Amino acid sequence: MIAIIGLGYVGLPLAVAFAKHYKVFGFDINSERISQLNNKIDVTNEIDFADQKIKNLVFTNDLEELKKCNIYIITVPTPIDQDNQPDLTYLINATESIAKILKRGDLVIYESTVYPG
């Protein structure tokens, strides 16, 4: 099973794409966002639930549900600070969160907007 961490403009379409072939858990810390997605509402208009036949996708903000997964794809934002340096706070927080539930053999992938260097 696959966990997509962060359901913004990168994570949500990725979760939907993977859910066409695999069981996927879409995780976000924003409980309002999870509630909207569970009610088939996407205020960002990244996906159109009417056009999607999504059956293998569960939206959650409960980290415990992700223990079932063995692939974790982190897609959280990496904004630029006032010095034009990437703010890695979201990336670090997401990493520390899933580190608590990782098992031997699990795979973590960073699909981030951070620039190289």
PLM ranges: what are they?
Residues 1-117:
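Structural/interface elements that position substrates and couple domains in central-metabolism enzymes
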